[in-house]
Amino acid sequence: MAPPTTIRTRDQALAPLATLDSQTNCRLKELVQWECQFKGAEYVCSPFKRLFEHCIAPDKSATNYEVTDTYTNS
């Protein structure tokens, strides 16, 4: 099971992280999930991409922020 992930809006993700200092390391991570539907005698699957900002705080704790927006999968 995946760990809990904080969900933020696009605007929140683009704003400076007030709780973390300017020395914080952040990387963009991508997760692809598949949405499948059964049609007739076969499954039709489409990818759904989710983006996360993975940040390491000064105390070495890691936090993931979802930054997926409406344009990510268009």
From Swiss-Prot:
Any one GO cellular component localisation term in the record: mitochondrial inner membrane peptidase complex
InterPro entries in alphabetical order: Mitochondr_Som1 (IPR024645)
Pfam families: Mitochondr_Som1
Keyword tRNA processing on entry: no
Subcellular location: Mitochondrion inner membrane
Keywords for the protein's UniProt record, in alphabetical order: Membrane, Mitochondrion, Mitochondrion inner membrane, Transit peptide
GO terms for biological process, alphabetical: mitochondrial respiratory chain complex assembly; signal peptide processing
Function comment: Non-catalytic component of the mitochondrial inner membrane peptidase (IMP) complex. IMP catalyzes the removal of signal peptides required for the targeting of proteins from the mitochondrial matrix, across the inner membrane, into the inter-membrane space. SOM1 facilitates cleavage of a subset of IMP substrates.
Oligomer status and interactors: Component of the mitochondrial inner membrane peptidase (IMP) complex which at least consists of IMP1, IMP2 and SOM1.
UniProt miscellaneous comment: Present with 358 molecules/cell in log phase SD medium.
Name of the protein in question: Protein SOM1, mitochondrial
Organism: Saccharomyces cerevisiae (strain ATCC 204508 / S288c) (Baker's yeast)
Gene field: SOM1
